[in-house]
C-alpha cells in the first residue's frame, strides 16, 4: 500500500506528493467473505433477510413499546430497506427477492501467543443480520477475519510492560522523508502519516467491490438454493481512539 507524504511549509498538489510504500498488510475481500456466508446453508439459516419492527406489551391494557435490540430491527436499517424497495418498484421486468446485508467492522490489537510479545492489529467483520446473541458466542465463529495490519511493540523500561501501537510506520520513513524534503518528519507529521495508513488500509477493505456491492448489489444463490439480490450497507465501524 502507498500513502502520500506531504511536508509542512512545502507547497505542492496532493497528487504530486511523494508516495511511501508500506508492506505487511494482509486482507481479504469483504464481499467475497459475505458471499460465502450467504451461500453456506448453516450460516444463511441463521440470518434475517427480512427486516421488521419488534414491539412488546407488559399487559393487555398497556401501550406497546418498540424494542431496539438488533440491527435488523433498527430504524436505520428499516429506512434503508424501504428506500431500496421503493426504488425497485420503478424498475421494469422480473425481480429477485432483494434484501440488505448489514456489515459491521471492528478492529483492535490482539496477542498471538500466551508467551512472548507477538501481536497484530486485527480487522474483523460481523453480519448484522445475525442475532447479537449468536454473535456474542465465541463458539459461533461468526467473526470473520478480513485484515491483518502491521503493529509495533513498545516496552516501558520502568514497568517492563508492553503496549501495542498501531499503525506501524517502517523505520525507512525517516530516510524517505530526508531524501525528499531534507529533514526528518515532526511528531505531528508522523501522527498524520499514521492516520493516512489506517485510512489507506480501510480503503483497501471497503473500496472496489465493496462500493459496487453497495451501489449495485450482488446476485447470489443462497444457502437454501434460492437466488437472491442483496445490497451491502456498512452500518457500523467500531474503532479505538488510536485509529481516529
Residue spans for each PLM region:
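Long, charged/polar, flexible scaffold/linker tracts and peripheral helical/loop segments
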Residues: 1-244
Amino acid at each position: 500500500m502507498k500513502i502520500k507524504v506531504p511536508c509542512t511549509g512545502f507547497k505542492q498538489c496532493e497528487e504530486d506528493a511523494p508516495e511511501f510504500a508500506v508492506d505487511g498488510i494482509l486482507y481479504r475481500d469483504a464481499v467475497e467473505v459475505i458471499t460465502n456466508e450467504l451461500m453456506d446453508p448453516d450460516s444463511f439459516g441463521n440470518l434475517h433477510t427480512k427486516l421488521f419492527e419488534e414491539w412488546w406489551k407488559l399487559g393487555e391494557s398497556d401501550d406497546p413499546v418498540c424494542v431496539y435490540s438488533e440491527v435488523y430491527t433498527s430504524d436505520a436499517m428499516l429506512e434503508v430497506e424501504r428506500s431500496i424497495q421503493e426504488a425497485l418498484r420503478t424498475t421494469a421486468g422480473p425481480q429477485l427477492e432483494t434484501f440488505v446485508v448489514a456489515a459491521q467492522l471492528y478492529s483492535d490489537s490482539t496477542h498471538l501467543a500466551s508467551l512472548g510479545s507477538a501481536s497484530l492489529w486485527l480487522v474483523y467483520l460481523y453480519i448484522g443480520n445475525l442475532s447479537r446473541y449468536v454473535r456474542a458466542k465465541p463458539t459461533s465463529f461468526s467473526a470473520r477475519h478480513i485484515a491483518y495490519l502491521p503493529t509495533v511493540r513498545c516496552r516501558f523500561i520502568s514497568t517492563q510492560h508492553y503496549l501495542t501501537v498501531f499503525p506501524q510506520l517502517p523505520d525507512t520513513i525517516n530516510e524517505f522523508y530526508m531524501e525528499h524534503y531534507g529533514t526528518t518528519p515532526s511528531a505531528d507529521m508522523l501522527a498524520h502519516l499514521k492516520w493516512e495508513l489506517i485510512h489507506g488500509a480501510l480503503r483497501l477493505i471497503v473500496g472496489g467491490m465493496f462500493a459496487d456491492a453497495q451501489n449495485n448489489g450482488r446476485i447470489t444463490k443462497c444457502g437454501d438454493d434460492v437466488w437472491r439480490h442483496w445490497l451491502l450497507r456498512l452500518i457500523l465501524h467500531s474503532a479505538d481512539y488510536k485509529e481516529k
